[in-house]
Amino acid sequence: MAKLHDYYRDTVVNELKAKFNYSSVMQVPRIEKITLNMGVGEALTDKKLLDNAVADLTAISGQKPLITKARKSVAGFKIRQGYPIGCKVTLRGERMWEFFERLITIAVPRIRDFRGLNAKSFDGRGNYSMGVREQIIFPEIDYDKVDRVRGLDITITTTAKTDEEGQALLAAFNFPFRK
């Protein structure tokens, strides 16, 4: 069992229940899933780039990614419908908690020139999205074996109804928001 999950159950639930005056523990927001997405537009010309991106995402998440395909053709980007253009992973349960712990304690502090995460990146319904410019902040990625520095999108989906509740949930885990 991940330490953060135990911490959530034992401490965070009680804090948030008191702060927002919930009548039931089931009303307290929780993290539902974490989605990692890596767009690889250059995969149109070199298929090996997509394979390397899949390998990176597998190492980061511990789960095999789904290859995403273009929904429609766009002549300006020279893509046709059905072309593979990226990969994504949805983490839930145990793997989600382990990834969240690694993200907060190891990966985010390794971001170059890090001054905190933007607290305005909530979507209006308590979900938080952030972008990472380099996949090498994760300790699972070996810097010497990286063919190209790629970024990825990380979306933390919560059951919170408002941004304030979502921010309080993530702040309870010492999520490094910018002051």
Curated annotation (Swiss-Prot):
Keyword Transit peptide found: no
Disulfide bonds: none
Superkingdom of source: Bacteria
InterPro entries in alphabetical order: Ribosomal_uL5, Ribosomal_uL5_bac-type, Ribosomal_uL5_C, Ribosomal_uL5_CS, Ribosomal_uL5_dom_sf, Ribosomal_uL5_N
Family: Belongs to the universal ribosomal protein uL5 family.
Its job: This is one of the proteins that bind and probably mediate the attachment of the 5S RNA into the large ribosomal subunit, where it forms part of the central protuberance. In the 70S ribosome it contacts protein S13 of the 30S subunit (bridge B1b), connecting the 2 subunits; this bridge is implicated in subunit movement. Contacts the P site tRNA; the 5S rRNA and some of its associated proteins might help stabilize positioning of ribosome-bound tRNAs.
PANTHER family assigned to the protein according to its UniProt record, in alphabetical order: 60S RIBOSOMAL PROTEIN L11-RELATED (PTHR11994)
Quaternary organization: Part of the 50S ribosomal subunit; part of the 5S rRNA/L5/L18/L25 subcomplex. Contacts the 5S rRNA and the P site tRNA. Forms a bridge to the 30S subunit in the 70S ribosome.
Protein name per UniProt: Large ribosomal subunit protein uL5
Source organism of the structure: Glaesserella parasuis serovar 5 (strain SH0165) (Haemophilus parasuis)
Organism ancestry: Bacteria, Pseudomonadati, Pseudomonadota, Gammaproteobacteria, Pasteurellales
